[in-house]
Amino acid sequence: MKKKFLSVLLIVAVLIGMAGGSGRQTESGEQKADKEQKQQENEQTAETKVEIPPENEEEQKGWIGVILNGDETEAYTLAHIDGIRAAAENVSLPEQDIIWKERVGANDGCKSAVKDLIRQGCEIIIANSAIYEEAIKSEAEKNPEVDFVVINDSKTQSTVTEDGTELTNLYNVHMDTYEASYVAGVTAGMKVAKLKEKKKIPAKSFDEKKNVKLGYVAAEANDDAHADINAYYLGVKAVCKKVVLQVEYIDAWNNSDAEATAAGDLIRSGCVVLASNTDLDAVMQMAENAKERGKCVYAVGRNSDMRQMAGKAALTSVVSVWSVYYTELFDAKLNGRYMEQNWNGGYAQGAVTISTLGKSASSGTGDRVKKTEEKIKNGKKQIAYFSTRALDGILESEKGQEQ
């Protein structure tokens, strides 16, 4: 409406000008063209001004700031995004109260993100990776009025600074995924046992001791990875004793090429089932590609249900239910309740699980998994946190229990 009104006024003004000038000397063609051009420019300027938005638009203000090492295209990061959103919904927290920072670098990148989030009013800052541990600790010391949460790769992390100061605003979180890794191992063991029974395992997939070869790709050789690897291996052995697990450490969390290369090496060496502790899904994709080429290869995924991308190869996935922790955190902060500074969550808390079994899982696996999970939940079965690195990257069937 504003545009129409302005245009009408301008047209009326032109008509009046033309009528008033009828007794004047006739203008030259050049002068007339000049006037028409200026008139056109004035019309455009008037209309453009109506559509210009306010220059000083209010900046987003938040209550929770989230620092992510990836984005929603990566399984690990997406699991956190989904968990935080679900938790926000559980406590009726508006989406606009959350400010996201994606693909943030460690150290300086993290510190810069923290400063920006505090400037925007965030009172809780969550960092979803252990790469931010030192930077977050430093910022927590400088900003005691802000609560900091960092996801760690070890069950025990200190909230004390080098000079002995206790940081009451620093919260360490660890998911006991090794418990779910054990259950995933049971799933893999059921598959291997069935393949052996039906004599479908090729000769190259046995070592010289007649153990079936399994493969594992790990991002880093840290305590958490070792605990997951060992628990997974022992889960397999609970069903199928004669197995050997070959482990490839790639020293990278977000490197799909490195993941794919390691997975390819394991497949070529004859590994029947692959598993991983990485942020991406390249291992599962490599297993699916090999399966489509007729190879005897299956896989256990990580961080999310991967059946959609690997319908033939996927057996299950090890999953952290992040909404459990984030709901507890948000609820405690909203209602002034105590929150543990070192939080560990496993099956008992509903914080870890395995995803829905894939079509390739062996018959009877569901019942076996259900019984195993119940025993872990009620404490009848304790899954040990073995954090010792496997010797030479290999867990042999005779030495698995001691690893």
Regions found by a protein language model. Give the residues of each.
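Sec-dependent N-terminal signal peptides of Gram-positive bacterial secreted proteins and lipoproteins
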Residues: 2-25
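A residue-level marker of the well-folded mature domains of exported/periplasmic proteins
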Residues: 29, 34-403
